[in-house]
Amino acid sequence: DNWVDNCNGRLVVPGLGAYRMDKSEADWAVNDITDQIDYSRYYGGAGCAFFRCGNVLYNDKGLYKELRDNYYKYPAQLPPLTWLNDSVPAAPEGIKVERLDDELHLTWEKPVSEKQDLTYTVYYSLTDSIDTASAKSILATNIYGNELFLPIDVESERGYTFSVTASTRYRIESEP
């Protein structure tokens, strides 16, 4: 049976044993881990957890580089916990972009109607429309404040479109 088919609306996040890549453990190759990621994605897993972090970051077989370059290129939001609460928060208000010397300063206001703590995700695009369903559009996520500073290269400055969403502690995201 597929665990995802029997998860009762909960998230399935397989734990992958990156420590098994050590010669003293099982001497796995990088593809032993990436095959498990592919399998989890194919069956609808909500992501992967790696045990132990040091085995990912300092692995001499190149696991970190493989994950960074081919599996986790873009920032990602954590999946929503809809079984705990599915209330959609109001969208941030008063989004402004100002240029301050060699930085862009994005600011927004917490919606007046929201009493709970929120985190924010900033999306961007080089066109007038933003695909918020694509991780490629996420500039930053899990922001706790209401501002973001972005360094810019004055010589290659381009026009960007920005959008900001709010998320609850259950990771339910507002509309942009």
Regions found by a protein language model. Name each.
Residues 87-96:
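Proline-enriched interdomain boundary motifs that mark the N-terminal boundary
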